[in-house]
């Protein structure tokens, strides 16, 4: 885990500091410091990230060669699909994975637009035909992710 985990209230060190102190990183941010239930969820996604090492490496290589972002708007990958130009709450991770996270509190399912083609739900292997909007379950421990099939 990266970043800053408060709360804390540290007075400014001098007039160049707006509070928080220099080099302060907040509270512990290791996976296990968030409690057992959260650890289980974060560990699952950490393991998925490790298993995608080669894919992620290739995305970084592509980015260094032609500037393609790792995280892409839907219209970046599907410029001819007018619906993809309207989507704000789902994205592509590289050219293969469509990610549809939850953005709203107490929401446990969501609509996901699948562009043309065939898409596999990475959680259960179910295959969907693209060109449609589906309803995807999204319990607290499961982010809807769909892999574009060749």
What are these regions (language model features)?
Residues 1-150:
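Catalytic-domain carbohydrate-binding cleft regions of carbohydrate-active enzymes
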